[in-house]
Structure formats: C-alpha cells, structure tokens
Amino acid sequence: MPKEKAVSGRAAQESRYLNPVAEYLPIYKIENGIIYTKDYRYVKIVEVNPINFMLRSSREQRSIIYSFIGFLKISPVKVHFKVLTKCADINRHVEMIRREMETETDENCRMLQEDYLDLIKRLGSKEATTRRFFIAFEYESEGARRGNEEAQAISFLHTAARTAQNFLKQCGNDLLIPENEDEFLAEVLYSVLCRQTSNLIPLQKCVPQVIAEYAAAGKDITDIPCSEFFAPKTLDFTRGRYVCVDGLYQSYLLIPSHGYKAEVPAGWLSLLVNAGDGIDVDLFLTKQPKDRMVQKLGQQLRINHSKIKDASDTNTNFDSLDDAIKSGYFLKRGIAENEDFYYMNTLITITANSPAELDYREKEMRKLLLSHDIGCVTCTFREEQAFLSALPLVSLEKHLFERSKRNVLTRGAASCYPFVSFEMCDDNGILLGVNRFNNSLTIVDIFNSQVYKNANISILGTSGAGKTFLMQLMALRMRRKGIQVFIVAPLKGHEFYRACKNIGGEFIQISPASQNCINIMEIRKADKSADELIDGAMTEKSALSSKIQRLHIFFSLLIPDMTHEERQLLDEALIKTYAACLSKPNLRQILPMIRLVFSPVAHLICAFSRIVAKASSESV
C-alpha cells in the first residue's frame, strides 16, 4: 500500500464514508485474499474445521499435538487463533427439509416434516450455537521496506496458508477453501462485527442495501470503502465496563501472566472454547528470536542469583526468586533442546443481550476459570483497546500485551491446541437434540462415511431414561428422509405400534397366537445388481448349499450340544426336504391333486349354470 497515497488522500477518504463506524475500523481494503490495514500491515485469515479432540485416545492426542508442534515451528512470527461463537446457521438443513417435503406423498409424513421444520427453526433461533475457528497470519517484513513489499506479502501469506493446510491435515483438521477469498474475508468480518444483524441478514443481502444508500446520497457507487459492507451501525464506548456493538453488549477478560497453571493437559483450551453461548476466545502467539532470548535469560538468571544470595530463607521473596530461577533454567534448557520461545496472550470476549445478562455471564465465566485454577482480570476502561484487539487482525494492544503475556516453549504453546469442538452437525442428518455441554445442535448423518467409520450406534441408559423414545424418534426422522427402517423389539414392540401405523408402516407381530410367522427355510434370491455394477459379472453360487449351511448354524444355536451323528442326520433331512420341495413338477403327479381340489368347484359351477338356464327359459 503506498504510504504517500494514503496520507495525501486522507481528507478525501473522510468524505467517502456514510457510516462513521466504517471509517473508524482499522481496515483499508480487501484485495487478493489479503486484508490491508490502515497501519500498513498485511493479514490473511483462514477457517479451520475442528475435531473432537477430547474423545481421541491418548496415543491419538499425542500424535495431534506433535503435528501441531510441527506447524508452530514453521508458522509466521505472529499468529492469532480466534474462536467465534454465534447462533447456529441452519439454512442449508432447512432447505434440505423443504426439498424432502416436496417429494413426500404421504400426508401424515408431510405433517411430520412440517413439525420437524418448526422445531428446527425454533431451536436454531433461540438455543443452538455453533463455533467457527480461524487463524490469522501477519506478514513480517525482513529488513527495510522495499517497493515490491506488497507482492512479497501476498506470496508469503498464501504460502503460509498452504503450509497450515498441509500440517493441520495431519492433525485431522481441514481448511475451508472458499471460491472467492475476498468475499470470504468480508463475511468473516461481518460475522465478527455484526453478530446480531448477520443472524438475520446475510452479507449478500447487505451489499445491495449499502449500494442503495450510496446511490441515494449521490456518491460514487464504484468507490465504496470495503468497511462499509461489514461495519456495524452502532458502536458505543461510553461505558467503562462494556461496549455496545450492533445492539449487543460485550465485555472482555484477560488471563494475566500469573493466571496460568504451571502444568496443563493437552487441549486444555477446550475448557474456554466450549464454555457456552456468547463466549469467544482469542489466542495470540508471538515467536521470539532464540539468540536474544538466551541472552536475556542468562542476564535475568544472574540477577536473580545475586538477589537470592542477599535474601534469607525466611524472606518472603525467597520462594518467588527460587521459582524464577527454576523457571529460567527450564526455559533455557528447552531452548537448548531446539524449542522456540513464545509470548502467549489469551483474551476472552463475553457477549449478551443486556447489561444484566452480561454481568451474569461474566460471573459464571469467572467461576469456571477459578474452578480450574485459572485467574482472570477485566479490561475496565480499556474496552476500546480490547475491542480492536479481538478483531482477527493480529494486533493486540501494547498495554494488554504487557499485562497478559506469558512465556512458553513450543510444547506449552502446542498444548493450547484450540481446534476442539464437541459439535456433531451434518447437513444431511437427523436432529437428535441439543448438546447440553455447549448448546450446539446434534444433527447426525450416520451413513456419512467421510466423517464416521461406520453407521453403528449403541444406546445405553437406565430404565426410564428414554432409550425407546430415542429409537422411535430416529426411526420417524429417518422415515422422513426416505430411509427404510426395521426395528426388532422382543419385549416392547407394542410401544412402536401407533407410530408405525401413523406413517404407513407395517407392524408385524410374531407369536404363537399371531397370524404372522417366519419361514426360516425359505430360499430367497439375493439382489446382486449393486455388486455386479461395481465388480462386473460374478460367479453364480449355489443358493441351496448356502441356505443349508445357515440352517446348520441356526440349529446349532438352538441345540448347542448336538453330536456329530445328529448333525449328519440333520443334514440328510434338510437335503431330502429340499429335494421333495424343489423337484421339477410332473403333471402325472400333480393331476390327482388338481382333481381333488377342483372337482367340487366344477360340480358347483355346472349346477349353478343349470339353475341360471332354467330361470332364463321360464322368464321367456
């Protein structure tokens, strides 16, 4: 970005804005998939799909952390991880439900789909939340600025994004690659700044409104600043404890330098990431030069050694100096073992609809952090600086940075692995409920082999917990999607009767007094069309021998202590039975049977014909 052009055109730029908030934001333009800031920095944002890290085995977790360590070692100097919590986007799921309703022919199933659609809309507008995970990179110029710095920044940031994609794929995370990167960046900023408006009006509908406003004001619609499209209409910094952005109230918490635990497990940041609705987390990592940090550590160790010599064992500073010396040696040993030195900062954003709700959420967040021995401080009278720092622009305000920086090595930074989510939300799935841990919708497509290894589900619970209800709910919602469902219920089959009849299903009861039964000896021809389509023509196998083998297994389960002689007799009996049943028909053999069955019918028909003929002659 040419500095002279930006400075000389400042007066003209001030008149370009209709929204003063758009002029206040530190964003100059979005181009080439890069954000150009007003302080002449270049930033790129990528979105990451999370994984359920806490359900992985210890071995898998260790592998993920080691892969994340590899990513941190080759990442840019400044990295900003942002977790955004907002209302769940259910538009794609709703559209799929509507398409299924158009193809449904059964009236009862259509009513079921309408009720399901109302439920999805109600949950999506009030209760359900979702989380989006972003990484923001900043370009760090080497040496003095040169004329081709912009081209170097674009190349550097795109390379950093591709590298992140390769390394995070080893962790199990996928990067979302948008078709239009500039539009994606605008949509991300719109979601961050206009939380309430973005839930009602998507960015695609907001753009024509801004263009219409500029046209009505008589301004050039070809020279609209990009910040006008994602800037909120209201921004209030007049309060010391919170800010008001787009009609929502936000406050900020910092984890100070002394607020972290000395030892943490892998993925400990999931405590904050999945804290609940209205909680955003920003994690900043700043890599420091090794040679300079080794020099500073050695200098500080010498100073602390000289101080502890003058302090007695009963002095209050003795323990703190001793801990500082041990920490210094730990950091120095880690750097010697080829680990990098980072400054880590954690900023927590709390969002609510009213000041009272904001106070309640802030107190609950403090309790949650305190229960895990993590301290926090408020950003009172520095809410504006915290607001700007929470933007995904890799720019933490200096005072907040000094107040919250914590020195960590590469392994400590990797333990903050942030891409952790308990969400299970598939567009083509069925709703099972709301996750009570993080208020996310649980919409599962168990047949999606790209996400799940198989379609097996185990339902466990105490008596009265709702196992049968859940099974019935899944069956009804799978029927809504056109999936054929069979339920084998030995003891509770009657509980499924009404649901089965109301959606046009078939209720089959198998008992000694029932009209339905199962013929275990029937041979049915298997449908191999799908296998032949995939593998081509297949060798025809004997259906009789396969059936006899399965019957042997069936009878061995009924009679476990069957002897070899009995097995041989059973095999002989089965062969004779099928030989008598499956032999080719002989007319001489079946003619007596036909005469036996149809002779009385023939006599009745002849007698009836005579009666009809006699009645006709009498009428004439």
Feature roles, as predicted:
Residues P2-F419:
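Extended, folded cores of ATP/NTP-driven motor/assembly subunits in large transport
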Residues Y24, I34, V46-N52, S58-I74, ...:
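P-loop NTPase motor domains
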Residues N166, L476-F486, I503-G505:
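Post-Walker A helix-loop "phosphate-sensing" segment adjacent to the P-loop in P-loop NTPases
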Residues N456, I487, G505-Q509:
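Conserved beta-strand scaffold positions in the cores of enzyme catalytic domains, especially
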Residues I459:
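Hydrophobic anchor at the beta1->P-loop junction of P-loop NTPases
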Residues G464:
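Walker A (P-loop) phosphate-binding loop of P-loop NTPases
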Residues K467:
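Conserved lysine of the Walker
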Residues L470:
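Hydrophobic positions on the alpha1 helix immediately C-terminal to the Walker A/P-loop
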